Curated annotation (Swiss-Prot):
It comes from Byssochlamys spectabilis (Paecilomyces variotii). GO terms for molecular function: pyridoxal phosphate binding; transaminase activity. Homodimer. The keyword Transferase applies. This is Aminoacyl transferase sphA. The keyword Cell membrane does not apply. Keywords: Aminotransferase, Pyridoxal phosphate, Transferase. It comes from the Eukaryota.
Length: 470
């Protein structure tokens, strides 16, 4: 199979960007040399981020990596709805004119916020230009002095950024999705903080509905039960990041919280627009008190220009598609395709042997068995030293996936992440499965041969390309 030039050129560009730079900068000023030395730490593990072009938008590769989960961008549905929305307001302003509290507020944004709040079962909504800034706003405005934050160890970087600048001095992580570890963390905080014991301060619990690197789902119901037990004075509040649940989970994509009927139990929700909704921004859902706290204490509200009319209009357009049921078929197809992948990959004749040899593992299959839904995120594990080789194998097979490495995940936890979309097909899934097992079979043959130093063909091609670009 011929590999498109774009894939080869992108791989070559990526490899070039991983070359160490600092050793050639001895005559540079300390400012630039120190920056390059820091970047070389990333380059040394092939984890240097670059501005590489994607290979799926033009059809060079099959998209199993993008965030266009409902395929609203690819199909043009969102564009059509957006242009229709703009046509209703021919005199719209391009510029909001200031922050939400300094002249930049306007009727349309308030109307859209309330529509979203009503749709998702919240009292209020407050819009942000990104999910990252929404999370930072939450943690820099909501925790009060004396409060404590108990958080899942795998929460987003934006949550950590916000927590680091929060007024909560006590922050305790618990082992990912482990309700026993969560109980221990809650008890530890309760026993060590007198003001929380007497009910005058609160424990804020930070979790995500769906975890972006593992694809698993937060046990929200069980965690709420534990929190009620540990905090009889009800001085706890859950903050739930719904970035990967919005548009995917629940009827009409309302997210995990509303799907479980927990709208009244969760104090703060972050619902982003940059994943399934195929646009940008986020909304923070909560009570009027929560909204007022952010309007007064969050710098990313008070010191940032309010979202413009077009950016609000495209978010409204996306939620219109959800609310009217226009995306339900896409949602259902994601559920079908993920289950189809699970069945196809786990029924392969090499599945058990590959698992036993550590060549292939997909823990999310087992984790999903007891739920009435699956998520679109499917991490694929192989041996750590083979992770890049599997990535090369799939890239050269014209399959676009994402290699997840340190520092995105802890050292020794590298994996490939597959994202399944509404417009993927069964035949594309079949091809993906066949290519995964093509790699597995090749590695089995290499190991059986006992030939030292032998590497798979895709890796040979990539390393030859690296040498040619040295």
């Amino acid at each position: 199979m011929a590999v498109p030039d774009k894939i080869v050129s992108e791989l070559a560009s990526w490899m070039k960007d991983q070359k160490l730079v600092a050793p050639q900068m001895k005559d540079a000023t300390a400012f630039y040399r120190n920056l390059e030395e820091a970047l070389d730490v990333r380059r040394s593990t092939q984890s240097m981020n670059t501005r590489g072009q994607n290979t799926w938008k033009d059809g060079s590769a099959i998209d199993f990596c993008s965030n266009d989960l409902l395929s609203l961008g690819r199909t043009g549905e969102l564009r059509t709805e957006f242009l229709s929305e703009l046509a209703k307001y021919p005199d719209f302003a391009l510029y909001s004119g200031g922050s939400r509290v300094l002249g930049g507020n306007y009727d349309y944004i308030e109307k859209v916020e309330q529509e979203i709040a009503d749709f998702l079962g919240a009292e209020t909504a407050l819009m942000f230009d990104s999910g990252f800034n929404g999370n930072v706003a939450i943690y820099t405005s909501i925790p009060r002095p004396g409060d404590a934050i108990v958080y899942d160890e795998l929460v987003h970087l934006s949550t950590h950024t916000g927590m680091a600048a929060s007024l909560a001095a006590t922050k305790v992580a618990f082992r990912h999705n482990d309700i026993d570890a969560f109980r221990e963390a809650m008890i530890s905080v309760m026993e060590s903080q007198p003001m929380i014991q007497d009910g005058s301060r609160s424990i804020l619990v930070s979790v995500e509905s769906v975890y972006s690197m593992d694809g698993d789902v937060c046990p929200l119901v069980e965690m709420l039960e534990i929190a009620r037990e540990i905090c009889p004075k009800k001085n706890f509040a859950f903050i739930t990041d719904e970035a990967h649940a919005t548009g995917i989970i629940g009827p009409k994509g309302v997210g995990l919280v509303k799907h479980l009927g927990l709208e009244k139990e969760i104090a703060v929700r972050l619902n982003t627009s940059g994943k399934a909704l195929a646009c940008t921004g986020s909304v923070v859902l909560g009570s009027a008190t929560v909204r007022n706290a952010m309007l007064n204490f969050a710098g990313s509200v008070t010191n940032t220009t309010a979202p413009s009319f077009p950016s609000v209009a495209v978010v409204r357009s996306a939620y219109n598609l959800l609310r009217t049921g226009a995306t339900q078929k896409a949602q259902d197809n994601i559920q079908h395709l993920v289950r189809y992948f699970f069945k196809s990959v786990s029924s392969h004749t090499l599945w058990d042997q590959a698992n036993d040899m550590g060549l292939l593992s997909i823990p999310i299959i087992e984790e999903s068995k007891d739920r009435d839904f699956v998520t679109h995120i499917v991490p694929i594990w192989t041996r750590q030293k083979y992770n890049w080789w599997l990535f090369f194998h799939l890239q050269l097979a014209k399959i676009a996936v994402v290699p997840i490495n340190y520092p995105q995940v802890p050292k020794g936890k590298a994996r490939l992440r597959i994202m399944i979309h509404a417009t993927n097909t069964e035949s594309e899934v079949d091809y993906l499965v066949s290519m995964i097992y093509g790699f597995v079979k090749e590695m089995m043959d290499i190991e059986e041969s006992g030939e030292k130093g032998k590497i798979p063909k895709a890796a040979q091609k990539i390393y030859a390309l690296m040498a040619a670009n040295a």
